[in-house]
């Protein structure tokens, strides 16, 4: 019960700030998990309903995490954008794996000077019978295709160029490299 009262107070404060022309901001400094994504989507959906079209800044410092949960958060950010919100995404610290994909979700993508981006092939852990694992491989291939689509659409690189860079390794980029390749629009 106390959690609901606290959440209600936070919602009221967010509404008060939004009416004053403030940008709504959310810091996602966590692993991408069902719980962390659920909390973030709850906030974003609340903002979308209460103040359609309001400006939003999302700051990411994430080592990545669960692929499908990351895509759910990416889609929630796209709903905000389609609803007229101007969404700025910022990378600070480390935006790795799915964290790098989430950074791509904004209208404007900013990276802090000392931040790091890490991009790699989609990875997952599965166990089971051979036929089940083969089904999972098909799913991983689809998820990897989606990640490549997002990264190539938001950068100056083609799918093939990205695949060649990340094949069988983690690909680390400093902020100036990320800017040069179009993974961000600005470095601060």
Where are these regions (language model features)?
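N-terminal organellar transit peptides
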Residues: 1-188
């Amino acid at each position: 019960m106390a959690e609901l009262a606290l959440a209600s107070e936070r919602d009221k404060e967010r509404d008060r700030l939004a009416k004053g022309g403030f940008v709504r901001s959310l810091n996602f400094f966590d692993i991408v998990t069902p719980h962390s994504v659920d909390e973030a989507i709850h906030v974003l959906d609340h903002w979308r309903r209460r103040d359609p079209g309001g400006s939003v800044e999302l700051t990411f410092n994430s080592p990545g995490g669960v692929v499908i949960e990351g895509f759910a958060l990416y889609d929630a950010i796209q709903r905000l954008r389609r609803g007229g919100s101007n969404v700025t995404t910022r990378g600070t610290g480390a935006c790795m794996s799915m964290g790098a994909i989430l950074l791509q979700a904004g209208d404007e993508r900013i990276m802090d000077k000392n931040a790091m981006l890490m991009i790699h092939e989609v990875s997952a852990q599965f166990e089971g019978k051979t036929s089940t694992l083969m089904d999972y491989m098909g799913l991983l291939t689809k998820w990897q295709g989606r990640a490549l689509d997002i990264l190539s659409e938001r950068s100056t690189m083609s799918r093939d160029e990205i695949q060649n860079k990340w094949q069988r390794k983690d690909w680390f980029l400093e902020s100036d490299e990320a800017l040069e390749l179009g993974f961000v629009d600005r470095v601060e």
